[in-house]
């Protein structure tokens, strides 16, 4: 019985990986994981499904999750990211671990999205148990080194701080309703919408000036002097000092040239509390690297420790890279006696060669033609 037309398709936003694509993804992933290991990060794996009670989204994020029910009626969620599941795991399975703890991962995540695929591969790290700006700088530097390691593209890292945004909003005294709308448009880089929103609220000119300039504040360290002209609020001074220190440490790591300070960055997940960053590559209209500090998350799991980390959208990066061929077999073995073909193929594989054996008798000419179509350069015919 033939499958229906629906049975021949895959759900919207999901994808198959053909050999060339998978080979490229696996090489990039292995390269990133080897780098993470060299920086003392240990790989972990969490379940594809988590209880909804673990993920606990804020209202605006909930619609982006894939949800289902188990047989007991509990809400289950396909993991939309790895930071929260790892926080659950560390707080339960690894309680009492010596901090700081460095963990890394490679996994598929699932989110409804208008801008890109709904299933995508991520590699990333979590640095748990340190509030130092050096920890923030380490994860930014590691993200940069990972992008360099994957190779083949230009990229730009934008670095900001959530405390600067909240400090400025507090200084200006804008209504909470306005702040939520402004924050939403700022996260989407909707500059036209921001200008319209600010004008509609009719703030005094000084407040309007700050609100319209903030989204465009990006550059090098001296840009932070502008922020201090707007406010000397203690929380804002602390955030600016922390961001300065992270930026200076990045020079020590030798990666500062890849980084631009950007005070318009607001991460999409609600748990970010300090330094935040995004990475962009040409041809992709959304960040391929997202990360930052989230010091409040572990407290929700009963383990009150600071943390920072990042995730790289490997799928988005690979789509921008030219697919190289998957590793083709090196030797094609054929012959009239299947037992001898099997024996010869085994012998060659034991030497480390990639071997394809012919399953049917072929003439020499047929074998050459078949190997040529497959891109196999060496042919062994056994009698």
From Swiss-Prot:
NCBIfam families: hisZ_biosyn_reg
Main location: cytoplasm
Subcellular location: Cytoplasm
Function comment: Required for the first step of histidine biosynthesis. May allow the feedback regulation of ATP phosphoribosyltransferase activity by histidine.
HAMAP family in the record: HisZ
InterPro entries, A to Z: aa-tRNA-synth_II (IPR006195), aa-tRNA-synth_II/BPL/LPL (IPR045864), HisRS-like_core (IPR041715), HisRS/HisZ (IPR004516), HisZ (IPR004517)
Identification of the protein by name: ATP phosphoribosyltransferase regulatory subunit
Annotated metabolic or biological route of this protein: Amino-acid biosynthesis; L-histidine biosynthesis; L-histidine from 5-phospho-alpha-D-ribose 1-diphosphate: step 1/9
Matching PROSITE patterns: AA_TRNA_LIGASE_II
Miscellaneous notes: This function is generally fulfilled by the C-terminal part of HisG, which is missing in some bacteria such as this one.
GO molecular function: catalytic activity, acting on a protein; histidine-tRNA ligase activity; transferase activity
GO cellular component: cytoplasm
Subunit-structure text: Heteromultimer composed of HisG and HisZ subunits.
Domain of life of the native organism: Bacteria
One Pfam family named in its UniProt record: tRNA-synt_His
């Amino acid at each position: 019985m033939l499958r229906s037309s629906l049975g021949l398709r895959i759900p919207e936003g999901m994808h198959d990986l053909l050999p060339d694509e998978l080979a490229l993804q696996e090489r990039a992933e292995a390269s990133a994981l080897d780098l993470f290991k060299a920086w003392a990060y240990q790989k972990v794996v969490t379940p594809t499904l988590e209880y909804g009670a673990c993920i606990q989204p804020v209202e605006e994020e909930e619609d982006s999750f894939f949800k289902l029910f188990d047989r007991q009626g509990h809400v289950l969620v396909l993991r939309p990211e790895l930071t929260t599941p790892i926080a659950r795991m560390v707080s339960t399975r690894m309680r009492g671990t010596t901090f700081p703890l460095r963990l890394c991962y490679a996994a598929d995540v699932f989110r409804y999205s208008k801008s890109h695929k709904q299933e995508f591969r991520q590699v990333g790290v979590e640095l748990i148990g340190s509030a130092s700006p050096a920890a923030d700088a380490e994860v930014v530097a590691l993200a940069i080194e990972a992008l360099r390691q994957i190779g083949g593209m230009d990229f730009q890292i934008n670095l900001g701080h959530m405390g600067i945004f909240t400090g400025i909003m507090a200084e200006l005294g804008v209504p909470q309703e306005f702040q939520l709308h402004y924050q939403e448009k700022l996260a989407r880089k909707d500059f036209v919408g921001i200008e319209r929103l600010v004008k509609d609220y009719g703030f005094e000119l000084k407040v309007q000036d700050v609100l319209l300039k903030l989204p465009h504040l990006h550059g090098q360290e001296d840009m932070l002097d502008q922020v201090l002209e707007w406010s000397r609020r203690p929380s804002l001074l602390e955030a600016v000092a922390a961001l300065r220190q992270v930026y200076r440490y990045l020079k020590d790591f030798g990666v500062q040239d890849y980084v631009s300070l950007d005070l318009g960055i607001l991460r999409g997940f609600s748990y970010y509390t300090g330094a935040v960053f995004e990475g962009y590559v040409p041809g992709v209209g959304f960040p391929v690297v997202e990360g930052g500090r989230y010091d409040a998350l572990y407290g929700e799991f009963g383990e009150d420790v600071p943390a920072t980390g990042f995730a790289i959208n490997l799928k988005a990066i690979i789509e921008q890279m030219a697919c190289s061929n998957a590793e083709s077999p090196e030797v094609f073995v054929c012959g009239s006696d299947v037992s001898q073909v099997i024996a010869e193929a085994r012998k060659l594989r034991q030497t480390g060669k990639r071997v394809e054996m012919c399953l049917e008798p072929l003439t020499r000419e047929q074998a050459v033609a078949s190997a040529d179509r497959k891109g196999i350069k060496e042919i062994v015919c056994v009698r």
